[in-house]
């Protein structure tokens, strides 16, 4: 609220804003006891984008399962969430989204499953390996996702994500191996991963879906428009650093005539904008009638 007031756009922003919030018991230092709880409440302004339908976890038309994958590249087991749409069969050869942060994928799947059931988007498969830990001991997730911090760790994760994951997914679930029906997806540091991987392996991915990127274009993520994937960008005006970086990507792609789409929302660094924009990106990529 204070950020909205400081920009002098209070009424306009409030009418267009969407954000999640929650209530948690605080200790004497003002910190949530036991950590931050669920962000299970929603504010949606009267002029904000319409809320998309969502299915409950136990009411999915498709299926969401967890698999244990032994990765030679990572030298460890890594859990992978796999969403299969209703009616899937191994010979379906469906479009596939390779996503980061599989340990947090459920809210996205609820929206995608509903959108598929309502025929708002075509059936897709989602392959989402869990992220490395991000806790008081350090941010291992960022070391795997982003170039320029730990080259060996980043390279090992690239071999896992790009090579091992796609081979396993094609063999186990019959997902498409065609570039135009492969997408890579991530938010925040996951968006940086999507942009870096999409650039480095442009022959594999026809679409790069990157929301609220924290790393602007530059030396760490070089981008050449020649043969680049279509980039779907989204950021909220109330997440200043991430909005600035994502807007820089939009400007960079526009300047270099690299195909892209940038959606700007009145929102913070908030899950709600990401789960609502992903079905729209899928419709834009593979649907006949893009969602508004």
Language-model regions, residue ranges each:
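Short beta-strand segments enriched for Tyr within beta-sheet-rich domains
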Residues: 17-25, 82, 94, 161, ...
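Primarily recognizes the serine-hydrolase "nucleophile elbow" in alpha/beta-hydrolase
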Residues: 110, 171, 178-228
């Amino acid at each position: 609220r204070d950020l909205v007031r400081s920009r002098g756009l209070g009424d306009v922003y409030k009418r267009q804003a969407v954000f999640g919030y929650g209530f948690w018991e605080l200790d004497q230092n003002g910190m949530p006891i036991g950590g931050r709880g669920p962000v299970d409440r929603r504010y949606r302004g009267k002029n904000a984008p319409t809320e998309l339908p969502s299915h409950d976890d136990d009411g999915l038309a498709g299926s969401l399962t967890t698999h244990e994958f032994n990765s030679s590249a990572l030298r460890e087991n890594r859990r992978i969430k796999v969403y299969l749409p209703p009616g899937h069969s191994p010979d379906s050869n469906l479009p596939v989204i390779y996503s980061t942060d599989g340990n947090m994928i459920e809210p996205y799947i609820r929206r995608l499953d509903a959108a598929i059931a309502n025929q708002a988007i075509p059936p897709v498969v989602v392959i989402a390996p869990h992220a490395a830990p991000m806790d008081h001991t350090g941010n291992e997730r960022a070391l795997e996702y982003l170039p320029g911090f730990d080259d060996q760790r980043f390279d090992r994760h690239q071999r896992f994500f790009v090579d091992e994951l796609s081979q396993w997914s094609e063999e186990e679930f019959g997902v498409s191996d065609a570039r135009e029906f492969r997408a890579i997806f991530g938010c925040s540091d996951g968006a940086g991963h999507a942009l870096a991987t999409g650039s480095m392996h442009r022959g594999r991915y026809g679409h790069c879906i990157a929301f609220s990127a924290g790393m602007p274009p530059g030396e760490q993520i070089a981008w050449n428009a020649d043969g680049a994937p279509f980039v779907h960008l989204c950021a909220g005006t109330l997440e200043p650093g991430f909005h600035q970086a994502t807007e820089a990507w939009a400007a960079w792609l526009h300047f270099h005539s690299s195909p892209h789409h940038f959606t700007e929302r009145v929102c913070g660094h908030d899950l709600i904008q990401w789960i609502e924009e992903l079905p729209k990106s899928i419709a834009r990529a593979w649907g006949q009638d893009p969602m508004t």
